[in-house]
Amino acid sequence: KNAEFVAFAQSIADAAVANNVKSAEELNEVLINGAKVSDMINDKLASIGEKIGVAKFERIEAAYVASYIHGANRMGVLVGLNKEAAEVGKDVAMQIAAMNPLAVDANSIPADTIERERAIIIDTMKEDPKMAGKPDEMVAKIAEGKLNAFFKENTLLAQAFVKDGGITVEAYLKSAGDVVVTEFKRVALG
């Protein structure tokens, strides 16, 4: 990943933005200085002898999009915000890189994921000898508490803010002028 390769990758990323590309397939057809991106990638492959390509393509549309690249270009995060807030966007993107939330909030987690987690919790509780003989209502209440703990750990807004563990990300966003995260994307190599 020398400077030449990084510049090559950046030129492709710039072309994706400039051409409002929405998919990897569409990106392969974009022209840069008269050459298709797919042909440029094949030429680069021939010169470096390693298979390269655009394996994943993410795009966010928001009033403001912040980005963060972590770990020698091995992970990237995009965060859509309701307004321009560069420092807040970078802080939130770093949070996402570090804590890998599943969604912005509990309402954004797919129903099948919630049901799968609920089933795991209930199955685990059924196998727990301490739960034997407990009323179903009590088991259901405990399961909901465990599900809420799952949301706290796995949703961005409910997570403890990594730069100040005394507040949640949601509280940080409010204190920064009611900044709202509209969506995020986290992509890691490997």
For every predicted segment, state its role.
Residues 1-190:
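N-terminal assembly/interaction segments in proteins that build large macromolecular machines
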